[in-house]
Amino acid sequence: MKPFFSIIMACCDVEPYIREAVESVTKQSFGDWECICGIEESKDRTEELLREMAAADPRIRLFTHPRSGSCSATRNIGTDMARGEYVIFLDGDDTIAEESLARIHDMIAARPGADLYPCEIIAYTEGAEDKREIRENYPPDSSPEELTGTEATLLLQRLWNSNFCPMLQMTVFRREFLVEHDLKCIYGLRRQDSEFSPRALYLAKRVVPLHEPFYLYRLRSNSVSSAAKTAGHFLRDWAIINQSLFAFHAKVSRESGFDRRVSDCWARQGVSRFLYLWFYPQNIRAIPLERRLETLNILFSEGFHDFNLLLKSAGAGKRLAGVWVRGFVRYPALRGVAEFFFHCYFGLSEMKGKKKTSFSVLHSDTPADVKQM
């Protein structure tokens, strides 16, 4: 008999935290679950401790795989292995709140069959556990009880602009929905949530916010997500994310029934973020030209078609900026002029009183070595 929940846990070098993470599941009063732990090649006793706990509870299932530097492999393999009706993603240094599985089960039972059940997370910094912050994308006073994926996409843009939290851990997924759409994370990508979540949200037929603070998210300096903030990984990851999301828009925008407001929404989010990351004056000064060109060549390795298509839904200023982006990438002689244009572009935007683009939720998305300069 298949369990109600499949909890997929990414585990790599988390010896100090792994027992607490697993016990936050095993001590739940609701017991109809399986916990699938993906063990990346670790330098500490993570695997040893997990094998000890799995021997004591047959609901804990283990698999190992080579070190990849991200949670993508565990999440993909774990989804393939999962037998439960609903999937929860948990990191090996985080926990879930007491009695939360029972509460979520009852809420799902009251509104069964949705593809996504967004919840809340409780974020805290290691060493300052008494200072906690609840984060939610769908405030009860601003969100209907149920939405389509398109409605949810547009609502997040209206409520948060680009500042909604894309973390997979915030959402309970119907497993058959993930399988039906072959929703997978890009292998090795450290910011896979930012690429995966917009696609999953758009494809969902039913989204039911639960307003349940069930996930305890630990912010620590040596985590994978913190390592992803270094500029070397940072721009490469965002190049891959943008390339994928631009291509996804190009695909779904050709389908019958596509709501053109989604193009407007994604253009406001995606084009603004792209211009800021590669061409905001502070980033131009802080990130070497070679690194920006290297990652732009990754982003546009298949050409500019998908970018141009999304750009059509952007405002006139962003469309003009897109012309200079293409010139910057294609023609070395124009790079200095293009950078001067972007100094003027962002300067005028700020003079008009527009908010400087921000993509932070739990922490800044700008890498530390950029912010410090």
Summary of predicted features, one role per range:
Residues 92-209, 215-233:
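Donor-binding/catalytic cores of nucleotide-activated saccharide
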Residues 13-27:
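Short, well-formed alpha-helical segments that are part of the catalytic scaffolds
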Residues 87:
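Short aromatic/hydrophobic "clamp" motif used to bind/position activated sugar donors
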Residues 31, 39-49, 67-68, 96-97:
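A conserved acidic beta->alpha catalytic loop
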Residues 281-373:
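Membrane-interface aromatic/basic loop that binds lipid-linked glycans or pyrophosphate carriers
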Residues 213-221, 227-256, 273-306:
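Catalytic core of nucleotide-sugar-dependent glycosyltransferases
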Residues 2-8, 26-37, 45, 57-61:
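Short loop->beta transition adjacent to catalytic acidic/histidine clusters or analogous donor-positioning motifs
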Residues 65-82:
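Glycine-rich, basic loop-to-helix element that forms the pyrophosphate-binding segment
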